[in-house]
Regions:
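Short alpha-helical segments and helix-capping/turn motifs at coil-helix boundaries
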Residues: 30-33, 91, 182-185
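Immediate flanking context of iron-sulfur cluster ligation sites
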Residues: 24-39, 69-86, 221-231, 261, ...
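Soluble N-terminal domains of membrane-associated systems
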Residues: 1-2, 33
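Non-heme iron-sulfur electron-transfer modules
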Residues: 2-20, 45-81, 93-123
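Iron-sulfur cluster-binding electron-transfer modules in prokaryotic oxidoreductases
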Residues: 101-320
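A short, structure-level motif marking secondary-structure boundaries and short turns
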Residues: 18-19, 28-29, 62, 199-201
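Local cysteine-cluster metal-coordination motifs and their immediate loop/turn environment
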Residues: 34-52, 77-95, 199-205, 231-242, ...
Length: 320
């Protein structure tokens, strides 16, 4: 039976199991899932993973999954960005369906296997080191220089040759100040009913701190007690997309030390980047289901609009 009326469910990711990186077991599951995808194709309009998969099958000698070599599936895995759109909006065979298809987490397993074999490119290692890039690029003297060179055509051509970053790709600009440096003492009068700790995220700390400016102003206007979380690290989503799960764990352990005290004290933790919220709300609880601090932070974190809607529903949101 296709699909169902039940809510999609997700299972924890047993990534520390010795069989998780077993390629023979992985390939068997990969081909099982791809065979169902091949027969359905409802997801073809989503990310490039699916057209890539279907083209590989259609151009094979058998016109079936068995006509595609295991190595050719690397392209399909690389094109998945773990956005979950297929899982949440298209696939009729996700759990609790008997076929139990979780395409994004299967791709994550493939990425983890690739990373374990040291196949991650230098470019990807650099681009996913967002804390390092942010600290370097947001220095007052360096930021305008980097922004200037990123607009020069010859420099972008060189960058394309060295790091394979497309010359026409729009790169984020660095700010000459960080959100954390501006709001070292942001906390205002305590409001026991409404108190928020802002997780600035890498992007809005180093690239667009003006978003944090606006967020702080809106919250203060609504008499919300505001604090900025200090000394945090990247949420780990970029490293998750590489399959670098051990680094994800290290980042999580560091951040939990900063986050859990706010969650225990009744703060809502707000992050302005949806993928960062998703990381703490969904991915980390599935990767570390036994960690009580992860579950605690997962319940406390939300995006700004979810929090403002809470105020609106309580009749305390100022609309002026």
């Amino acid at each position: 039976m296709e699909g169902g009326l039940q809510k999609p469910t997700r299972f924890s990711i047993d990534w520390k199991n010795k069989d998780y990186l077993n390629e023979e077991i992985f390939e068997k599951e990969l081909r099982r899932v791809f065979d169902h995808c091949h027969g359905c194709r409802r997801c073809v309009s989503l990310c490039n993973s699916f057209p890539t998969l279907f083209d590989l099958i259609d151009e094979s000698k058998t016109f079936e999954v068995d006509g595609v070599t295991y190595d050719q599936f690397d392209k399909v895995i690389d094109h998945c960005y773990l956005c979950d759109l297929c899982y949440m909006t298209k696939c009729p065979y996700v759990p609790p369906h008997d076929w139990g298809i979780d395409f994004p987490h299967l791709m994550l397993r493939g990425k983890a296997i690739k990373h374990s074999k040291s196949k991650t490119s230098i470019r990807d290692k650099i681009l996913t080191s967002t804390d390092m890039l942010g600290k370097l690029g947001s220095r007052k003297i360096i930021a305008p220089i980097i922004n200037y060179f990123n607009e020069i055509k010859i420099f972008r051509i060189i960058l394309e040759k060295i790091l394979r970053i497309h010359r026409n790709a729009k790169l984020p600009k660095f700010s000459s100040y960080t959100a954390k440096s501006k709001y070292k003492n942001v906390s205002n009068e305590m409001n026991l009913d409404n108190k928020v700790a802002i997780f600035t995220t890498c992007y809005h700390n180093y690239n667009e701190p003006n978003v944090i400016d606006d967020l702080v102003k809106v919250l203060k206007h609504n008499n919300v007690h505001v604090e900025l979380i200090k000394d945090d690290k990247c949420c780990g989503m970029p490293k998750l997309e590489l399959g670098d799960l051990k680094t994800v764990e290290k980042m999580m352990q560091h951040n939990l030390l900063k986050f859990k005290k706010y969650a225990k004290d009744g703060y809502r933790i707000i992050a302005p980047v949806p993928s960062c919220v998703l990381m703490f709300k969904q991915e980390l609880p599935l990767l570390f289901p036994e960690n009580k601090d992860v579950q605690l932070v997962s319940k406390a974190i939300c995006d700004p609009f979810e929090y403002l809607l809470k105020l609106h529903n309580a009749g305390t949101l100022k609309m002026d």
